[in-house]
Every structure is written in C-alpha cells, then in structure tokens.
Amino acid sequence: MAVSKLWSVTSRLGQVIDYAANPEKTAADIYTEEQYQALRDVLSHAKDEEKTECEFFVEGINCNPATARDQFVSVKKAYGKDDGIQAYHGYLSFKEQDISPELAQKIGMEFANEVWGKRFQVVVTTHLNTKHLHCHYVINSVSFVDGKRLWGDEKAWFKFRLVADRLCEKYGLYYNPNPNRSKQSSYYYKQEQA
C-alpha cells in the first residue's frame, strides 16, 4: 500500500531539492566488484566509469533535476509570483515488500505525471535508505503553462490516494480498496468530489 503526504515549502527551495536528490539516499549499487571490473574491461572506451558503478533514482518532469531550482525560480519570476509558497514537497511510500527501486521510481514517475505533469515542474526521486522505499516529489508552486499556483487541499489528497491505489493495483502491489479511515460524512463527501 502506498502512503502519500504533501506539504508546502516557503523558503530554501534549493535545500528541499538537494534533500530529495541526495545521492546517499538515491544511489543503488547494481554490480558486484567482479562485475564492475568486467564492465570496466569491456566498456572502458564507451562509458564513464563512475556512471557504471551505481544508478541514481532522480528524474525531472518538465525540468532538469540538476538545474530545477533555477528553472522553478525562472517560472515564478516570469509570472511575478516569486513570493509565498515556493514549492510543495511530498512523498509516496511503499509497504515493505518485494518492490525494486526501479519499480518504485517507475510508479513515482507515473504518479507525478498523472497528478502534476501537464502543468507543473516536478523533481521525482526514490530514496533507498530505509526499509520502505519511498519517492519524494518537489513540485514548483507555479505552473509553467499558465502561471497559476498549485493549491493543496484535502480533496487533492483523495485524488492522490486514488491514483496511488490504482498504480499499486496495476503493478500487483498491496493496496486497501476500502480504507475505513474516518466515519465522518465530510470525509466521504470529499472522497466523492476528488
């Protein structure tokens, strides 16, 4: 089951992006030392050695993760909205089970594309440093398409949950199709509106 959360970032945009893309959290050793040597021998002319040693799970949607901060700021300045909320930071965490970093990142990218990809710049990373693999999202608070701000509310959270549940089902991961999280009628009303 995937769990999601989203919160606003009002300062230090660069630090949030750096945290999400932290190499110590997003790198996976994919080869043994023996395999490294074989790769070095075979691919020494074609590949940079550092790039064959590990894989990083850091991608961008409508932006380059390496320059995302500058790209986010450029969009804000272009629309005169460089104050207030700078970005949103969120995560999608997976139940401890057999999920590979590759699949977590794939689901994370699909999730971000569906929820924000048509209008917003998003940095998507998968952190591998805990028992529960989890994707981090840093979303520009201003749309590059129309300059409108991203607003997070409880209704949006239900949409996130529905998208996450559908993707978990699609990839054969556990999800709870009928969570009884609250007995309040407003909870169900907001769910229906999502």
Task: Tell me what each language-model feature is.
Residues 1-194:
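N-terminal nicking endonuclease/strand-transfer module with a His-rich metal-binding environment
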